[in-house]
A protein has these predicted regions:
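Short amphipathic alpha-helical interaction elements and helix-loop-helix interfaces
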Residues: 57, 61, 65-81, 92, ...
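Catalytic cores of NTP-dependent nucleotidyl/adenyl transfer enzymes across multiple folds
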Residues: 96-97, 132-343
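Generic preference for flexible, low-structure residues
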Residues: 102, 121-123, 207, 248-250, ...
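N-terminal regions immediately upstream of nucleotidyltransferase
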Residues: 1-103, 109-179
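Acidic carboxylate-rich catalytic motifs and surrounding loops in phosphoryl-/glycosyl-chemistry enzymes
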Residues: 84-90, 206-217, 309, 350-358
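Terminal (often C-terminal) interaction modules
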Residues: 1-52, 66-83, 277-280, 292, ...
Length: 394
């Protein structure tokens, strides 16, 4: 579709033009020295996050691994969702942060149905552009035969209700669901109770203090030891098949119904940044470019996700060898110019939806990979005032 390709063509044209214009200069060593020195001067004047992101990510990963061990023990015979090992998502696990302080370490905990239950994802056709909303319908399944037979479990479908009430815990339908659908807020409250109960048994509790923070759609907490602290947010999700796309508890709007689970591409995006990290030179500054430009735009009309999308597109176009210190200023100019061009033509393609050029290790459901590309700037098409305001940012 011609319209769908406009955004990528804008990015392609700008990047190629920039590289062609500078190709001759890059061959000369003298220019390399000047550009490298300029990049060094700019970087020295930038304030990077105080916290060591790699250290914070490792600490968070270790903590969630310990939680997972206890989740397995406590929930193995229950009828609550089965909690899988947490997956680090978001900017910190991608290797950057838009803020100097108050870094949030975000993880996604995949959930699978407990025995005697199945999950079915139902697409909400009333979803907005670029955001597919789902509901997770919970159904009971017969356990009279098969792997659960004789496993000290009564069949929810075929045993009398009186016998079930007297001899077995209630099904998931009666604990975390609203009208047969998994409820985000009930799930969050349940997870808070788990964290509060398990924390004293963890080795981290001996030297760290846990403070639970309020949230209706996730579990947020801060851990401190007097010298340093980490803020962690735990999201819950259900995987779509065997792909890297989930439906998650993170809402896109303030008034999202509690049975709505928006589609999230956070795991796929983390895998993309890991793919890039394996291919760039050791001194690559692609993350610092993203970090600096995002911080530059804080408080403007452009979201962090918009800037990240522009950079992800550029990372697939500009060779990985051209993100070194000597290229730092030029890459910042690329990001700025590409953002301006996308605003001007009122089109910025979503990086995951409909992108058929992603690395093979990123697994997408067929309907996501083959879908029509989604314009993140659709609101600028519909609202001339918003478009004029966005242009004025430059």
């Amino acid at each position: 579709n011609e319209e769908d390709n406009v955004g990528n063509e804008v990015v392609n044209a700008a990047a190629i033009a920039e590289n062609n214009n500078n190709g001759a200069r890059e061959v000369e060593e003298g220019d390399h020295d000047v550009e490298d020195n300029m990049g060094r001067i700019v970087m020295e004047r930038i304030r990077w996050p105080v916290q060591d992101l790699q250290k914070g990510c490792k600490w968070t990963t270790d903590l969630m691994a310990n939680f997972a061990i206890y989740f397995g023990h406590i929930l193995s015979t229950s009828f609550y969702p089965v909690l899988q090992r947490a997956i680090g998502v978001g900017s910190a696990f991608e290797g950057w942060s838009p803020r100097e302080r108050d870094v949030v370490y975000r993880v996604l905990v995949p959930m699978t149905p407990p025995r005697g239950h199945t999950f079915h994802l139902e697409l909400d056709t009333a979803g907005q552009r670029c955001v597919r909303n789902f509901r997770v319908r919970v159904q009971l399944e017969c356990t009279c035969t098969g792997e659960h037979q004789g496993a000290d479990m009564l069949c929810f479908l075929h045993h009398p209700e009186e016998e079930l009430r007297s001899n077995q815990d209630p099904s998931l339908l009666h604990t975390l669901c609203t009208a047969s659908y998994l409820d985000v807020q009930k799930t969050a409250r349940w997870f808070y109770q788990l964290v509060r109960a398990i924390w004293p048994a963890l080795p981290q509790s001996h030297t760290w203090h846990l403070v639970l923070l309020p949230s209706r759609h996730s579990c947020q907490f801060k851990v401190t030891n007097g010298r340093e602290s980490f803020r962690i947010e735990v999201l819950f999700g259900v995987r779509q098949g065997d792909s890297d796309v989930f439906v998650s508890s993170q809402p896109r709007e303030a008034c999202t119904p509690s049975t709505t689970w928006p589609e999230t591409y956070a795991v796929a995006e983390v895998k993309f940044f890991k793919y890039i990290a394996r291919r760039v030179p050791p001194d690559s500054l692609h993350l610092k470019c993203l970090q600096f430009f995002t911080r530059l735009q804080l408080g403007s009309g452009f979201s962090t996700y918009t800037i990240k999308t522009v950079v992800m597109h550029l990372l697939t176009i500009i060779p990985v060898s051209r993100w070194r210190r000597r290229d730092f200023v030029r890459r910042l100019m690329d990001i700025s110019e590409n953002l301006r061009l996308c605003v001007e033509v009122r089109r910025l393609n979503h990086f995951i939806l409909g992108n058929r050029r992603l690395p093979r290790e990123i697994s997408l459901p067929p309907e996501v990979q083959m879908s029509r590309t989604c314009n993140l700037f659709h609101h600028l098409v519909m609202d001339p005032v918003a478009h004029s305001q966005a242009m004025s940012e430059y």
